[in-house]
Amino acid sequence: MDPFAFLAEAYEAWYETPLGAYVIAEEERALKGLLPPGESLLEVGAGTGYWLRRLPYPRRVGVEPSEAMLAVGRRRAPEATWVRAWGEALPFSGESFDVVLLFTTLEFVEDVERVLLEARRVLRPGGALVVGVLEALSPWAALYRRLGEKGVLPWARARFLARVVVAGDPTLQL
């Protein structure tokens, strides 16, 4: 069963609300400040391709395990290359991307450490691994936890992280 199937079409509608527009503008400002110049971007857990449409890389690749999200992403971001795959086993050669983006992805994977190791494996030397998570004590995580407790997918499967150690390197650039 695809836990994202019921919301794939409406996934981005939230960004059009006043609060959603504010949050996404802040996220975009933060992201653009972290992203180095380069040719290639891989987004793991790309969803509907929101970031793939907005980030300035000539080669953009989205990895998404949800067939429903993948279908919407291919329609909304046809300029990107889309691959149905899981973050724990990325189907790319080592050192293939200048930037790897994991944005609200680690909450939904089975093996966080494996995903981070895979991201590091496909990252070129000097590249940037950018990770965005819903912090465990945040109001957003509390809301999604409540939805999950009520059985609302995909939040019923989400895990919220108190901290992230990037595949053996505890250094985080903020």
Regions found by a protein language model. Give the residues of each.
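Class I SAM-dependent methyltransferase SAM/SAH-binding core
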Residues: G47-A89
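A short glycine-rich, Lys/Arg-flanked "PGG" loop and its adjoining helix->strand segment in the class I
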Residues: E113-P125
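A conserved beta-strand element that flanks and buttresses the S-adenosyl-L-methionine
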Residues: L101
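Conserved class I S-adenosyl-L-methionine
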Residues: M1-G47, Y50-R54, M69, A128-R157
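Short alpha-helix
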Residues: A156-T171
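Short catalytic micro-motifs in class I SAM-dependent methyltransferases
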Residues: T104-E107
